[in-house]
Swiss-Prot record:
Belongs to the universal ribosomal protein uS10 family. GO terms for cellular component: ribonucleoprotein complex; ribosome. Involved in the binding of tRNA to the ribosomes. This is Small ribosomal subunit protein uS10. Keywords: Ribonucleoprotein, Ribosomal protein. Part of the 30S ribosomal subunit.
Length: 101
């Protein structure tokens, strides 16, 4: 098989992303594949500005921030055992996983 697998993890909670990345790296290393990462990608911040009042007081505003955290993991010289281990892996529901082969 011996192909490169790229895994991108994305979440709004950095603890979930780090724990999931650590779990994936441990699983892949146990199967004997070579792992590069987890590589932290830039944090994407979305800032929302909202008026506090509905009618007057335009100067009074409130800001909310939504940060998304990303990690990148590359797996080299993977085998069928590596792919099976990744398929059986349980990850938290707050983490988006994107896999490219």
């Amino acid at each position: 098989m011996s192909q490169k697998i790229r895994i991108k993890l994305k979440s709004y909670d950095h603890n979930l992303v780090d724990k999931s990345a650590e779990k994936i790296v441990r699983t892949v290393k146990a199967t004997g594949a070579i792992v590069s990462g987890p590589i932290p990608l830039p944090t994407h911040k979305r800032i929302f500005t909202v008026n506090r009042s509905t009618f007057v007081n335009k100067k009074s505003r409130e800001q909310f921030e939504l940060s998304s955290y990303k990690r990148l993991i590359d797996i080299y010289s993977s085998t069928a055992k590596t792919v099976d281990a990744l398929m059986k892996l349980e990850l938290p529901s707050g983490v988006e996983v994107e896999i490219k082969v």
